[in-house]
Amino acid sequence: MQTNTRKVVTSDAKWHPHLGISFIGCLLAITLEIYFEERIFIPHSGGVSFGLIVLLVINMVTIPVVMALIALLCFIIHIPRKSVNCILLCLLSCILTIAGLFIAYPVGR
């Protein structure tokens, strides 16, 4: 007897291998934002940890958006997984996450 089983092929999903790279880029952006927190325009009037709380809240919103944008980009445009492309996608997600901070913060004021 033959059984008809459906095979899930991960090579068809072009966006799947790049999710980890975009997440690493977002973590790099969070690290840079925390390191340069004093130079970012977030006021410290609410206490010492107010700036870190604002950074974490904004990044919890921007990280899924950035990962979805990178996944959509990789799904539409087939980007082979080479080391140069991985580094560029990591930098792109880092830049988008930092840009998301500067876009989202004035709206939340």
From Swiss-Prot:
Disulphide linkage map: none
Transmembrane segments: 16-36, 52-72, 87-107
Thylakoid is among the record's keywords: no
A single Gene Ontology CC term: plasma membrane
Bilayer topology annotation: Multi-pass membrane protein
Compartment annotation: Cell membrane
Keywords noted in UniProt: Cell membrane, Membrane, Transmembrane, Transmembrane helix
Superkingdom in the source lineage: Bacteria
The keyword Cell membrane is assigned to this record: yes
Protein name: Uncharacterized protein YpfK
Organism the protein comes from: Salmonella typhimurium (strain LT2 / SGSC1412 / ATCC 700720)
Source organism phylogeny: Bacteria, Pseudomonadati, Pseudomonadota, Gammaproteobacteria, Enterobacterales
Gene name, Swiss-Prot/TrEMBL: ypfK
